[in-house]
Structure formats: structure tokens, C-alpha cells
Amino acid sequence: MGDAEAGKKIFIQKCAQCHTVEKGGKHKTGPNLWGLFGRKTGQAPGFSYTDANKNKGVIWTEETLMEYLENPKKYIPGTKMIFAGIKKKSEREDLIQYLKEATSS
């Protein structure tokens, strides 16, 4: 799939202001992403989500993240994530590869 090293750079540029990835990492404006894959939307313990996120009921996978990261507000109308999305498929693939490695043991 993607290139995790390139994905890490994308994460630092576009995501790290609001998210952490390490186990036990703190929530910032957005939730800590440890354990993201296989988790339902709106379920990171201790983070205050919008009803839209909690009610979406989707499991985060490579496929759902590909769609979400292209246009978050279209995928989950009512999300408080203020991020326009990543239009380039290759950049989304790189970011997802990085997240797969960085958010699990």
C-alpha cells in the first residue's frame, strides 16, 4: 500500500497539531489515535465526540479511512474535525500506512 515514512511527514504536517498516535498519548483538539484500526467511530476512551461521530457506527479500516480522509465533513456530517481532507490518493495511502504502524504494537 503506502509508504510509512512519507506518511509520517504528512501526519506531522497535517495531523499532529490535533492528534497523537502513541499508546497512552493525550487527547489534543482531536483524539489520541492509538488503537484506531478496528475501532468504531467516536469510541476513543475519554474523548468528547460529536453525536455525528458516535452515531456513524463505522469501523476504522484502510477502506473507511481512505474515504474519510478525502473529505471528513462529507463522510461524517457534523464532525468537529476542521480539516478539508487529502485529495491525493497516494498521500492518503501513505498516511494510512503510517497510522497502521504508529497506532498499534
From Swiss-Prot:
Main subcellular localisation: mitochondrion
Binding annotation for heme c: C15, C18, H19, M81
Molecular function per GO: electron transfer activity; heme binding; metal ion binding
Keyword Phosphoprotein: yes
Keyword Acetylation: yes
Post-translational modifications reported in the UniProt record: Binds 1 heme c group covalently per subunit. Phosphorylation at Tyr-49 and Tyr-98 both reduce by half the turnover in the reaction with cytochrome c oxidase, down-regulating mitochondrial respiration.
One GO biological process term: hydrogen peroxide metabolic process
GO CC terms, sorted: mitochondrial intermembrane space
Alphabetized SUPFAM superfamilies for the sequence: Cytochrome c
Gene3D superfamilies, A to Z: Cytochrome c-like domain (1.10.760.10)
Family matches, as InterPro entries: Cyt_c-like_dom (IPR009056), Cyt_c-like_dom_sf (IPR036909), Cyt_c_1A/1B (IPR002327)
Tissue spec. comment: This is one of two isocytochromes C found in the testis. The other is identical with the form found in other rat tissues. These cytochromes are assumed to be located in the sperm.
Subcellular location: Mitochondrion intermembrane space
Xref: Pfam families: Cytochrom_C
Residues with the N-acetylglycine modification: G2
Keywords: Acetylation, Apoptosis, Electron transport, Heme, Iron, Metal-binding, Mitochondrion, Phosphoprotein, Respiratory chain, Transport
Family: Belongs to the cytochrome c family.
Function: Electron carrier protein. The oxidized form of the cytochrome c heme group can accept an electron from the heme group of the cytochrome c1 subunit of cytochrome reductase. Cytochrome c then transfers this electron to the cytochrome oxidase complex, the final protein carrier in the mitochondrial electron-transport chain.
UniProt name for this protein: Cytochrome c, testis-specific
Organism: Rattus norvegicus (Rat)
